[in-house]
Structure formats: structure tokens, C-alpha cells
Amino acid sequence: MSQKKQKIQVEQKVPENVAKKTQRDSKLRDAVAKRRTERLAANKTRRAQWEKTAQAYEAEYKAADKSLVDNLRKAKTEGGFYVPAEAKLILVVRIRGINTLNPQVRQTLRLLKLRQLHNAAFVRVNKATIEMIRKVEPYVTYGYPSRAVIKNLIYKRGYAKINGQRIPITNNNVIEQQLGKVGIHSVEDLIHEITTVGPHFKEANRFLWAFKLRGPRGGFIAKRKSFINQGDWGNREDLINDLVKRMI
């Protein structure tokens, strides 16, 4: 008589500590995946908002340009004159070095963020800043920057000043972390605040490190002569844009 061999299946029980670790790891993976999904969704929403804001600014700029053209045409048709609003923003560029600088001039250049040759900085127009520029006028040239030049400077030469460090503005997160509390979340917000000399211009301008430009293509004409005397230093008004384009 043949005997049936019974197979005894031994159920191996997973140790409790291993089971708990597996469960914990699974929950951790789920939490990480959830956070990643939420982060991607938030980034998508922010990018959409940045794009919407940029489009709104572009519409605002076009409307302002159209208004200026319309006013000029109207004045010409009526035989009158149209006087644009006074400039609220100046771009100052240092064109001479440090030789034979007296302490007062040196300090004023530092206050204007012009510590080095070919540094450039934005300055809000008021009585105090005009007096500062006059003190250092033989060492700088300045004028009224166009929106295009402001944009090119920030995009191509813009660095942030964070805790005394010069940090490249590689994405909008750098701006949002430092200026989000005053409503500046993106590079287009930053450009708009500078261009319009908005209510938080001080914070926006303080955030920007001085622009480090190169010597202009073709060189300067005569740095020891004023611009009105066929030289370089002093007020160029709108012609500052031609110079800065050669220095970016």
C-alpha cells in the first residue's frame, strides 16, 4: 500500500519591524509623489500667472506709446506743442577710474552703486539724487533709459544682491523669494517696477546689483570733456541708450 506524502507548507511570517519599515517607506513614497504633483501644479499656475502679467504689461506699454504718438500728432495738427511728463528715472554709468578721487567723490560714487569703472545703476530723479550726480558729474555719464534698454540690462546683465552676495537671476524664484512680499514675483514685474518707478522702486532697485558693463564698442570720444562739448561725461538725455547698447 502506497503512502501519500503530505506536503507541509510552512507559512513564513514577515518580522514585525520589516513590515513596519515597508509600510513606512510606502507612505513616504506616496507623500513625496504627492508633494511633487502639488509642486508641479503650483509651478504651472505660477507660470500662467507670470505670462498673463507680462501680457498685461505689454498692453500697458503699447497704450502708453500710442497715447504719446496721438498727443504729438494732435499738438502738431493744432499748431501747438506737446510737453511730455518729466523723466522720473535716470541711468548713470561710471566712465572714469579711481585715480585722484577725493573722499567725497568716492563716497558719492559708492552711494550711487558705482564702485567700479563701467558700473551702471538706476537712480530715481529727485533733488537729493540730482545733487549727488552733480558732485560726480565729471566721472559719469547719464540720461533717460528706454524701456528696451532697461529690459536688456536686467535680462542680460542683471544680478541680485542677496546677503551681500552677487547672485545671478536665473529664474523668477530668486525674485519672488526676495520681493514677493511687495508684489514683485517675476522678472517682468521687476522691469515694470523699475520702468514706471513704482511704489516699491526702492526695494526693487536695492535688490539689483550694479550692472557691470564692458567698454563701449568703438570706445569713448573724450572722457575728460563734457558731452555738450563733444566729449563723454555729463547728461546725454535720451542718447544714453545708444551708449549703453554698445556696452551691454
Swiss-Prot record:
Family per similarity comment: Belongs to the universal ribosomal protein uL30 family.
**Keyword set for this entry?**
Ribonucleoprotein, Ribosomal protein, RNA-binding
Q: Name a Pfam family for this protein.
A: Ribosomal_L30
Q: Which Gene3D superfamilies match?
A: Ribosomal protein L30, ferredoxin-like fold domain (3.30.1390.20)
Q: What are its GO cellular component terms?
A: cytosolic large ribosomal subunit
Please tell me whether the keyword Ribonucleoprotein is annotated for this protein: yes
Compositionally skewed regions (Basic and acidic residues) per UniProt: 8-41
Where are the residues of the annotated region Disordered? 1-44
What function is annotated for this protein? Binds to G-rich structures in 28S rRNA and in mRNAs. Plays a regulatory role in the translation apparatus; inhibits cell-free translation of mRNAs.
Q: PANTHER family annotated for this entry? A: 60S RIBOSOMAL PROTEIN L7, LARGE RIBOSOMAL SUBUNIT PROTEIN UL30
Protein name, please?
Large ribosomal subunit protein uL30A
Molecular function terms from GO: RNA binding; structural constituent of ribosome
The beginning of the lineage is: Eukaryota, Sar, Alveolata, Ciliophora, Intramacronucleata
Which GO BP terms apply?
maturation of LSU-rRNA from tricistronic rRNA transcript (SSU-rRNA, 5.8S rRNA, LSU-rRNA)
